[in-house]
C-alpha cells in the first residue's frame, strides 16, 4: 500500500535555516511531512526572495505564508507576491505551536486554519519567572 499524497498547504520563509528547522521540528512532533514548504532567504536579495516565493506559490498553489519577522525581507517579499490575491494569508512572527496547530487543522481550509493557528501561536507564549 502506498502512502497518501500530501499536498503542501503553506510556505514557511525566513532567514538562514529558520524555515527548515521549524519544519523539521513540526514533522518530528506531528509525524506529518510535506504539508509545509521551506523558503530560505540566505544570501538572496529582496527581489530574489520575492521570485523564489512567487515561484513556490505558483508551483504549489498555496495561499498561506508564515514568516519569521514582521519587517523582514521574506515578509516584505511575500506581501508583494500576495498584493492582489484576495484569498491569501501572510502571518509574520511564526512559532512552533502555531505551525503544529496549522498542520493538524487539515480538515479546515488553509487560510482559516492559518488564522486559527495564529491565535494558538500567540496564546502559547508566556513569561516564566520574575527575572530579578
Task: Name every feature range the model reports, one short phrase each.
Residues 1-132:
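N-terminal loops that bind phosphate or other acidic moieties
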Amino acid at each position: 500500500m502506498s502512502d497518501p499524497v500530501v499536498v503542501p498547504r503553506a510556505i514557511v520563509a525566513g532567514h538562514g535555516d529558520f524555515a527548515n528547522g521549524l519544519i523539521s521540528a513540526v514533522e518530528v512532533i506531528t509525524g506529518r511531512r510535506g504539508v509545509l514548504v521551506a523558503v530560505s532567504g540566505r544570501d538572496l536579495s529582496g527581489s530574489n526572495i520575492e521570485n523564489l516565493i512567487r515561484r513556490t506559490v505558483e508551483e504549489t498553489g498555496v495561499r498561506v505564508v508564515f514568516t519569521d519577522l514582521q519587517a523582514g525581507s521574506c515578509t516584505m517579499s511575500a506581501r508583494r507576491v500576495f498584493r492582489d490575491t484576495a484569498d491569501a494569508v501572510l502571518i509574520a512572527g511564526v512559532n512552533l505551536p502555531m505551525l503544529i496547530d496549522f498542520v493538524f487543522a487539515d480538515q479546515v481550509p488553509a487560510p482559516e486554519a492559518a488564522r486559527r493557528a495564529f491565535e494558538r501561536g500567540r496564546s502559547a507564549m508566556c513569561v516564566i519567572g520574575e527575572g530579578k
